[in-house]
């Protein structure tokens, strides 16, 4: 006999619901002191000793016997070789996914713009891609080629000149799918290094690893902590927490589908969060039964069970309107609207990393091949953050080109404001360009 699931049950009608929900959502992402200090030591070593430190740390943490950085560099030919080592079906899937991701992100490209005022002054914005981006990819058997596509393709679409990938190969384990994905995505350089030391190398540069402008990509607590510390020296994408899925269902979807959708995120790790919200209490019972029945069939059953029982929940609400309220409160990474008319509810969704609309749109499709990016804000940060995209690899510069007439008119306003702030250098710089002698006589002699 299968033991019933121990997943948490909440009811929005409970007077303590808000408190219980806050407790469910709480997750501490801050590194402990020992991790923090180890990361600081690693960053210091890489900054001071460059390649030598990378070689030593790779030997220590990845169990590799390497004598120099030359052994930790993969040439383009090795990426092309990986394409021949995966199956034709795998290559076709990677290429199709890459094509869809590229097509979607092409639509995110921003163009420079400008306009001319009546006096000839030109104002505008110049959009420029980053020179170099660094992509961190977890290594070993738990590698994710889809992450390579999702991080590298937007950078290349943005026009980044060089994409540098770092991927650890613990005990010499190389994932051919990851290298094949790097080849398809157009990654320019690959180093087989990982951990905090790889992040430090990308941020500060070494004799072999070029310094980048931005570091993106997922990693463990050491990688995340290193990204926190190098932020400011370089840009970063985000500090990602555990994966999350929130399913809002009207009770009409197959319970097995919903259970498996919850599993799709719960299988990532024990801290992942999978939540179902529905106004149908009987449907929640059916999904709970599906969870119990399907759990033993999962390859990562132990991880799924820990996640579901520890951080998962089935939440009963009064109606669909309240379900949407709860969804906005949670601000999930992935939100499935498994309802009859998702378009009707879409305008009411304010906070979600990605929104999967309709019963047939499983979150897994977004993870791999739908097209939108799967690098999404977690831990409620969808309230103020967005998915990774082309815009993360472009920067904007303001353009101001004053005509003599424009400089004269703007100078009057600038002079008054600058003198109001007691910044006479600013004021005089603007005033030198004012051609209206009457204005100068009437204002500057009065010390204004």
UniProtKB/Swiss-Prot annotation:
GO molecular function, one term: histidinol dehydrogenase activity
Enzyme class at the top of the EC tree: oxidoreductase
Highest taxon listed in the record's lineage: Bacteria
Binding site for NAD(+): 136, 197, 220
Positions that bind substrate: 243, 265, 268, 334, 367, 421, 426
Catalysis performed (reactions): L-histidinol + 2 NAD(+) + H2O = L-histidine + 2 NADH + 3 H(+)
One GO term describing the cellular component: cytosol
Residues binding Zn(2+): 265, 268, 367, 426
Entry keyword Zinc: yes
GO biological process, alphabetically ordered: L-histidine biosynthetic process
Cofactor: Zn(2+)
Keywords: Amino-acid biosynthesis, Histidine biosynthesis, Metal-binding, NAD, Oxidoreductase, Zinc
Pathway annotation: Amino-acid biosynthesis; L-histidine biosynthesis; L-histidine from 5-phospho-alpha-D-ribose 1-diphosphate: step 9/9
Cofactor binding: number and manner: Binds 1 zinc ion per subunit.
Its EC number(s): 1.1.1.23
Signal peptide: none
PANTHER family with a match to the protein in the record: HISTIDINE BIOSYNTHESIS TRIFUNCTIONAL PROTEIN (PTHR21256:SF2), HISTIDINOL DEHYDROGENASE HDH (PTHR21256)
Function: Catalyzes the sequential NAD-dependent oxidations of L-histidinol to L-histidinaldehyde and then to L-histidine.
Family: Belongs to the histidinol dehydrogenase family.
Protein name per the record: Histidinol dehydrogenase
The organism's taxonomic lineage, starting at the top: Bacteria, Pseudomonadati, Pseudomonadota, Gammaproteobacteria, Pseudomonadales
């Amino acid at each position: 006999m299968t033991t019933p699931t121990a997943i948490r049950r909440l009811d929005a009608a409970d007077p303590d619901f808000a408190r219980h929900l806050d407790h469910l959502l709480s997750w501490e992402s801050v590194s402990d002191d020992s991790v923090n200090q180890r990361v600081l030591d690693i960053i210091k070593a890489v900054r001071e000793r460059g390649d030598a430190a990378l070689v030593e740390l790779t030997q220590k943490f990845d169990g590799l016997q390497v004598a120099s950085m030359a052994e930790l560099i993969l040439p383009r030919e090795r990426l092309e070789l990986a394409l021949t080592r995966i199956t034709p079906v795998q290559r076709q899937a990677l290429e199709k996914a890459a094509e869809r991701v590229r097509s979607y992100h092409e639509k995110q490209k921003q163009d420079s713009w400008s306009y001319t005022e009546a006096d000839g002054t030109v104002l505008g914005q110049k959009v420029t891609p980053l020179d170099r981006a660094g992509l961190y990819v977890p290594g070993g058997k738990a590698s994710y080629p889809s992450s390579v596509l999702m991080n590298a393709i937007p950078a290349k679409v943005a026009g980044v000149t060089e994409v540098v990938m770092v991927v650890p190969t613990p005990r010499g384990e190389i994932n051919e799918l990851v290298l094949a994905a790097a080849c398809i995505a157009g990654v320019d350089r690959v180093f087989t290094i990982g951990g905090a030391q790889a992040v430090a190398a990308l941020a500060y540069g070494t004799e072999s690893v070029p310094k980048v402008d931005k570091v993106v990509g997922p990693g463990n607590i050491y990688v995340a902590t290193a990204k926190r510390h190098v932020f400011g020296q370089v840009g970063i994408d985000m500090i990602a927490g555990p994966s999350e899925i929130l399913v809002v269902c009207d009770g009409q979807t197959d319970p097995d589908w919903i259970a498996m959708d919850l599993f799709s995120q719960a299988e990532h790790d024990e801290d992942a969060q999978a939540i179902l919200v529905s106004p149908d209490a009987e449907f929640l019972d059916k999904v709970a039964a599906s969870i119990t029945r399907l759990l033993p069939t999962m390859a990562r059953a132990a991880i799924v069970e820990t996640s579901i029982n520890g951080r998962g929940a089935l939440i009963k609400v009064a109606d669909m309107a309240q379900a949407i309220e709860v969804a906005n409160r949670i601000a999930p990474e992935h939100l499935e609207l498994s309802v009859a008319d998702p378009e009707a509810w879409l305008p009411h969704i304010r906070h979600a990393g990605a929104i999967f609309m309709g019963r047939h749109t499983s979150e897994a499709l977004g993870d791999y091949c739908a097209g939108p990016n799967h690098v999404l804000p977690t831990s409620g940060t969808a309230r103020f953050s967005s998915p990774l995209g082309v815009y993360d690899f472009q920067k904007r510069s303001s353009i101001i080109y004053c005509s003599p007439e424009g400089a004269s008119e703007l100078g009057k306003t600038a002079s008054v404001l600058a003198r109001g702030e007691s910044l006479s250098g600013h004021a005089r710089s603007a005033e030198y360009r004012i051609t209206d002698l009457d204005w100068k006589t009437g204002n500057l002699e009065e010390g204004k």
